[in-house]
């Protein structure tokens, strides 16, 4: 059985006090869930959040540079994340691609560096409105180029249709399920059927407590990468219960 996940991508939200308060409230109301729960605060809060983090909450960075050290102003490397005991990271989010012009080649380098360092990586992929689903195959082919089969056990994929991120639009359960099934076909073509069936693939894109249950009942969706709806600890705990 594939591992289920519920990961909150906080983006550039919450000050340090709010981030710590979330964790303290989370600890007071343990979630009854079979899913791996995680949060991704901004980089500057990772160290302090990690100090109060319970064992049943995974801490992720929102990005990592593929260069271990050097003259790269404004970036945080994967080795520096590991120095502060952060061993999980989101790579390739559409906002990184859109606002920071990250190409598939850059994402491939980040993915390769983080996986080779032993990190758990949540790789984001998704199409814009009007793009054919075959775009996902092209993107996967590029971002996974040169990545050894043995490293894929550390890989989680998050399918986030770009037209659904922060828009209030959500893919129907049928569309999300069928698209993720097609992603598994692409993985089997790039690697093999076993990898395709073993890899956890999440859905993201305007997921909230009001629609998560219906999405979670589909065969192919293995969890969720949630943005705005993950900022409220009570809503986060409600969403976690879909995998009770």
Curated annotation (Swiss-Prot):
Keyword vocabulary terms for this entry: Cytoplasm, Gluconeogenesis, Glycolysis, Isomerase
Binding residues annotated for substrate, in chain numbering: 9-11, 166, 206
Active site residues of this protein: 93 (electrophile), 160 (proton acceptor)
Membrane-traversing stretches: none
InterPro entries: Aldolase_TIM, TIM_sf, TrioseP_Isoase_bac/euk, Triosephosphate_isomerase, Triosephosphate_isomerase_AS
Subcellular location: Cytoplasm
Presence of keyword Cell cycle: no
Family: Belongs to the triosephosphate isomerase family.
Catalytic activity: D-glyceraldehyde 3-phosphate = dihydroxyacetone phosphate
Protein name from the UniProt record: Triosephosphate isomerase
Role summary: Involved in the gluconeogenesis. Catalyzes stereospecifically the conversion of dihydroxyacetone phosphate (DHAP) to D-glyceraldehyde-3-phosphate (G3P).
PROSITE patterns listed in its UniProt record: TIM_1, TIM_2
Top-tier EC class: isomerase
Keyword ATP-binding: no
GO BP, sorted A to Z: gluconeogenesis; glyceraldehyde-3-phosphate biosynthetic process; glycerol catabolic process; glycolytic process
PANTHER family reported for this sequence: TRIOSEPHOSPHATE ISOMERASE (PTHR21139:SF42)
Coiled coil: none
Enzyme Commission number: 5.3.1.1
Molecular function GO labels: triose-phosphate isomerase activity
Quaternary structure and partners: Homodimer.
This protein's pathway: Carbohydrate biosynthesis; gluconeogenesis; Carbohydrate degradation; glycolysis; D-glyceraldehyde 3-phosphate from glycerone phosphate: step 1/1
Record-level GO cellular component terms: cytosol
